[in-house]
């Protein structure tokens, strides 16, 4: 199974050195060019982790011409979100995105959407990680914005206290 990802989930997982979860769970991740450009702008250890993933299981797609339907649904989004929605729509793949407006646009196009927390819940169900809460809290400590409510809900869904 392959997926399309937006920038946010990749950065969040890179922050806690868990990009491998995407490879184990989904085998291949597809990125639109705008997301690739956003990832190339990262520096430090995150950039090194992202570079390793780009060299192995992440594929950068060719630019797509947006259909009128996708254009209309994604008018208020940034380039990365817009292109990620368009690529998921074109390839008919699951979209991994945390941005709320982007998720709404994708759902309006009848796309299946998941987020970083759901990826971690699935990873825990498959025995790949021990704690969803700990990883989400670590992401937040490293500057990835996550609400208390999201962390609590995800931990509960993962069967954690």
What are these model-derived regions, one by one?
Residues 1-93, 100, 109-111, 134, ...:
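Active-site-proximal, substrate-binding regions of enzyme catalytic domains
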Residues 115-158:
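Hydrophobic alpha-helical interaction segments
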Residues 97-119, 125:
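Mid-chain, well-packed structural core segment of small domains
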């Amino acid at each position: 199974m392959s997926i399309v990802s937006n920038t946010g989930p990749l950065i969040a997982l890179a922050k806690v050195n868990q990009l491998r979860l995407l490879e184990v769970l989904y085998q291949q991740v597809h990125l639109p060019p705008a997301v690739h450009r956003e990832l190339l702008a990262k520096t430090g250890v995150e950039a090194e982790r992202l570079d390793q993933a780009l060299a192995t299981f992440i594929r950068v797609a060719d630019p797509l011409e947006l259909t009128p339907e996708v254009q209309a649904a994604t008018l208020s989004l940034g380039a990365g979100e817009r292109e990620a929605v368009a690529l998921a729509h074109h390839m008919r793949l699951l979209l991994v995105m945390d941005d709320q407006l982007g998720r709404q646009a994708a759902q309006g196009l009848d796309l299946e959407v998941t987020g970083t927390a759901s990826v971690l819940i699935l990873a825990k169900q498959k025995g790949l990680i021990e704690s969803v809460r700990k990883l989400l809290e670590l992401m937040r400590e490293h500057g990835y914005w996550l609400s208390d409510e999201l962390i609590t809900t995800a931990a509960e869904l993962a069967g954690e206290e």
